[in-house]
């Protein structure tokens, strides 16, 4: 085995690509490394197309092995299970820029498997996996119009940083991943701390320029180690069939695409499609190979041609709007009475019901990653049920798309969330998509912002999101604001921007064609800003600022500080004290190592009671101070009295009364309340008490015992 190795410098890191030694039965395999973070990527491509296949079956699997970080998995089975949310998101990150680079009509099945086998805690494996997948596809010989490069861009001290380390990312105001070919950007995924449109565009351009090093290196690597290019030729278009479909459907489709209401339009289009299939199938000559799939493909291409040509010609869009008009907005807040915060955001035929829930720190999600555990205090979940598009379907665990859309919406809102110090709650937002016709993820951003404000979460600013589209024919192009589902499907770009009045918080871009210039992206960003400001204006009319107080049904969190040395006293032996406090008052208590105590309670009186009891437990006994106490036990030499914080002191027999006391039990009884003064606290912390001068003359024990018994029976 003679492995072929390509090594090059990429920013501050060294990238190594190796092939020829491992997984030699795969179509192509590459071991990609960046400073000790290593991802093994394989590509298997089938030579034959499955019969009846009418779409491109590309699958990307990304999997992290815990041995990569020198760890053994937790859980009963002690092995990796189904993909985590993070693994799913990285699989999508690999898929999105490579999918558009396969030619139209290529339906051979391809599976890419990226396995993280070694991890440097400072280098995230996602970029390494993307570079490895690009290299493996380039080596495989399949008709892939790559390679692609990938870059992460940070923004630290007003400077762009290429591929920042994990430590550098903590200081960065930007986390942007950009992928593209040598000619054009294909994908952007980013989260920002309210940067301007100009800064975001500059970051995309910077990342695309820097990744040319990767593209050049992969081209050299392919020249040395690549397999022969497949002699795949795109199938010749069936001109006669295309003309038949046009003759039957073109005029009727043109009319259908003037129906503005989605369901009515879809019914009309489905009826036309059924007619086309029925007519052509009936006319098929014996031995002629015309499948229903081919007819549908031509029909879809005709739909695309009609919609796109109208937009390029400057005609109104499908629903009658101009290119930069946002659909009608409708906003309601506080729609669910017992939730902590809720809102319904409707934009045309897209609608999101967003609900915010406040919880305590123990509700934080513990995420077990390769580099160790971390806790997440802001959770965002996106649900896309089939009824939202008028269909039936399975309902179960979230699909890849739901996970991806949820993460994008979370990125849009994360920059304006308060810190734990400012607002000591764990916050969960759930976006239920109840109607969908384009850009439900951006509706989720708007709905989440409204629900958080309704819940009284002190977000720094309202956030809105908008999806932009593009239709480009040769040198002519039109940028569309607030795209419909059809415009997304039939257009050349899906460009989503979320942000506040002052800047961008998230940007996601997927481009299906080459030739998108910085000029086009600048126009799209400017048009998106106008649309975003319009939406924010409507949102601010509905709820101008976060509510002054949280919901009556949300837990109130009260914070107090105690001496860290006293934490053990509040917890008690085996947790007995803190358990009694929570059970008796119906509160939950969290104590940090620095002595910060957080008490969560729906009822304010319960919280005040707990705080008073904790103050009592942690109070320092002072020499010379007078306290009320309770006799806990008697001895021949005196009585033990419990004072503040359940601390016991001894009243010596000589300190019980002014006169001589022969027998302690003649003066005191267990359970009796007495007033005592602290005489001394010795070096061992033992407390000496006296009842002289501070206590009234002690009565005879018979009356004392009677009083105690009466109290207990009361």
UniProtKB/Swiss-Prot annotation:
Its cofactor is Mg(2+). Its EC number is 2.7.7.8. GO terms for molecular function: 3'-5'-RNA exonuclease activity; magnesium ion binding; polyribonucleotide nucleotidyltransferase activity; RNA binding. Gene3D superfamilies: GHMP Kinase, N-terminal domain, K Homology domain, type 1, Nucleic acid-binding proteins. Residues 555-614 form the KH domain. It is an enzyme of class 2 (transferase). It comes from the Bacteria. InterPro entries: ExoRNase_PH_dom1 (IPR001247), ExoRNase_PH_dom2 (IPR015847), ExoRNase_PH_dom2_sf (IPR036345), KH_dom (IPR004087), KH_dom_type_1 (IPR004088), KH_dom_type_1_sf (IPR036612), NA-bd_OB-fold (IPR012340), PNPase (IPR012162). The keyword Coiled coil does not apply. It catalyses: RNA(n+1) + phosphate = RNA(n) + a ribonucleoside 5'-diphosphate. Belongs to the polyribonucleotide nucleotidyltransferase family. Component of the RNA degradosome, which is a multiprotein complex involved in RNA processing and mRNA degradation. This is Polyribonucleotide nucleotidyltransferase. It comes from Pasteurella multocida (strain Pm70). The gene is pnp.
